[in-house]
């Protein structure tokens, strides 16, 4: 099935098109054109601007719903409400918590994927629990500890492979080995909530870490004399 959307303006990756029509073919966006075939079905959004949906890769809750509720209702509520903000995909993000609680969140998320009526769940993000206390922010230090591969495997099994991002502090013991194993499983490793030195941070990067969390906020600040995580 093919139909067309008319709009005031269309935003593409490297250009903007004024007016015209965007084809939708079997549920997927197609080509833009100035005109449409005679008799074509057209949805009129001429007072609106059309742009790609946003992807929120770090979100703990929205519209009164919280990932730590550990409920399908909350995840689906976030999914529907996020459309109002232009978000079409997201990573529900869990905070530092006990191992079993995080495992339960993995199971709930895995069971919810595919039931969304709004923004799609693209995977799960664990912000913790492998942080350190100095720059803990809102994270609960009681449940912080050194990274353990066996925990990751248990979480990943419960999540049916949906745990795709995890943030940790690079000064934790055993970080390099953990990062190497996690990245083999397709998990993106982020660095944050950390009091690490530059050398500790770079060792984590060399092991495979590739993303930062709360840079210039949840980490020790740098000076003209010493580079740090930031």
Enumerate the predicted regions with their spans.
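Conserved phosphate-binding/catalytic loop of the ribokinase/pfkB sugar-kinase fold
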Residues: 132-157
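Divalent metal-dependent hydrolysis catalytic cores, especially in the metallo-beta-lactamase
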Residues: 60, 76-105, 119-132, 159-171, ...
């Amino acid at each position: 099935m093919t139909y067309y959307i008319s709009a005031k303006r269309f935003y593409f990756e490297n250009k903007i098109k004024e007016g015209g029509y965007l084809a939708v073919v079997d549920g997927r966006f197609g080509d833009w054109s100035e005109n449409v075939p005679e008799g074509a079905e057209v949805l009129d959004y001429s007072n609106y601007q059309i742009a790609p949906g946003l992807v929120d890769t770090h979100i703990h809750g929205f519209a009164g719903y919280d990932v730590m509720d550990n409920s399908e209702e909350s995840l689906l509520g976030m999914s529907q409400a996020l459309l109002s903000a232009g978000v079409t995909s997201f990573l529900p993000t869990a905070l530092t918590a006990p191992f079993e609680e995080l495992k339960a969140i993995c199971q709930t998320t895995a069971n919810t994927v595919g039931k969304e009526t709004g923004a799609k769940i693209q995977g799960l993000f664990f912000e913790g629990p492998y942080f350190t206390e100095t720059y803990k922010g809102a994270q609960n230090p009681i449940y912080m500890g050194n990274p353990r591969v066996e925990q990751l495997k248990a979480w990943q099994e419960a999540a049916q492979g949906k745990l795709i991002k995890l943030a940790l502090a690079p000064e934790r013991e055993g970080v390099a080995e953990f990062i190497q194993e996690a990245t083999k499983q397709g998990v993106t490793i982020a660095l944050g909530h950390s009091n690490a030195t530059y050398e500790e941070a770079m060792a984590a990067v060399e092991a495979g870490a590739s993303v930062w969390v709360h840079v210039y906020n949840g980490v020790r600040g740098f000076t003209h004399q010493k580079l740090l995580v930031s």
